[in-house]
Amino acid sequence: MAASVDPLVVGRVIGDVLDMFIPTANMSVYFGPKHITNGCEIKPSTAVNPPKVNISGHSDELYTLVMTDPDAPSPSEPNMREWVHWIVVDIPGGTNPSRGKEILPYMEPRPPVGIHRYILVLFRQNSPVGLMVQQPPSRANFSTRMFAGHFDLGLPVATVYFNAQKEPASRRR
Amino acid sequence: MAISMSMAMATPTDSVSRVWSMSSLKSALPSTASLRLPSSSSRRPVTLRLPISSPSLPSFSGLSPVNPLLSIGLPDWQSFENGFKIVDGGGRIYAMRHGRRVPKLNRPPDQRKALLRGLTTQLLKHGRIKTTRARASAMRKFVDKMITLAKDGSLHKRRQALGYIYEKQIVHALFAEVPDRYGERNGGYTRIIRTLPRRGDNAPMAYIELV
């Protein structure tokens, strides 16, 4: 019996990756023509290029976007939780991540086994952090909570997640 | 022994004294009660009565509703409310599905078992699978059963798991990691998340994942 109907709680995004937060900003994510809703299924072939993300807010506010996969390498054995795919900081409000500073270049989802969740988290920055942030040593074993705590980003302001699984090599007849 | 045979045929309720006792009840049973009669007969002189009226012996008497008090414990026992249904093996058959909790999944029993075995194998292998809601809710029981077997960890349980899961490596991996992962959790090792229906036939789909 679901204790909550919030899709982020049901999908255990809040819990595995994030803490409970109140969304204060709007973020709409598009992979090509497809709009991302919580829990929708995306094929890795459509996610090769970074998505178009529209962030609400004033242009004097700065935002940070992080995309992680908590189910790496497999949801039954997430040894490398989380695998970070993309980090962009200093995004001015009301624009998209191309106007920010890309700390970690975008890597497309490549789930080897099982169905993985890919979470896009948006934080509001209190101050520009462009110079302090460095690329994490490896993409594996990333912790979004620790990243937010390290740069004093606080709780997220918006989150969306989607599922992806490995596409079959040959088309099903 | 003639006395024990006759006492086996005595009916408890058509005595004048209306003595209900366990020994008199047992004496009405057809077979095994005769072993206990030596002890009970010493306590209750009533059971030593020879039968006077025996045509109300509760044997099969067609489809007429038999007095339920006379037929307790016999294989032809019919329920109070519908005395006209045919009963076999002690199970009741009703026209409606009331109280039947086994999901049939539109398959005969052998196929159903094979489907559930395959689904639990794949869930234990991949950690999260997408399937129809009926199948997801049907397989919860069997996934929990496999994880409980792994929690126990003995050789017998391992062999039982090997008899159910289709792939050996999955069983061995399961037995290796379950004590760490599910040691404190009591039951409820899966989670079902409903999702959008399937395009081809609008079947309601769900993700089922290991918690």
Swiss-Prot record, chain A:
GO cellular component entries: cytoplasm; nucleus
PROSITE patterns: PBP (PS01220)
Classification via SUPFAM superfamilies: PEBP-like
Effect of deleting the gene: No visible phenotype under normal growth conditions, but mutant seeds show hypersensitivity to ABA during seed germination.
Residue numbers carrying N-acetylalanine: 2
UniProt keyword terms in alphabetical order: Abscisic acid signaling pathway, Acetylation, Cytoplasm
Tagged with keyword Acetylation: yes
One Pfam family of this chain: PBP
Subcellular location: Cytoplasm
Tissue: Expressed in gametophytes and developing seeds.
Induction annotation: By abscisic acid.
Keyword hit for Cytoplasm: yes
Protein's GO biological process: abscisic acid-activated signaling pathway; positive regulation of seed germination; response to abscisic acid
PANTHER family, per the entry: PHOSPHATIDYLETHANOLAMINE-BINDING PROTEIN, PHOSPHATIDYLETHANOLAMINE-BINDING PROTEIN 4
Similarity field: Belongs to the phosphatidylethanolamine-binding protein family.
Role played: May form complexes with phosphorylated ligands by interfering with kinases and their effectors. Regulates seed germination via the abscisic acid (ABA) and gibberellic acid (GA)signaling pathways. During seed germination, MFT expression is directly repressed by ABI3 or promoted by ABI5 in the ABA signaling pathway. Involved in a negative feedback regulation of ABA signaling. Promotes embryo growth by direct repression of ABI5. In the GA signaling pathway, MFT expression is promoted by the DELLA protein RGL2 during seed germination.
Protein name: Protein MOTHER of FT and TFL1
Organism per entry: Arabidopsis thaliana (Mouse-ear cress)
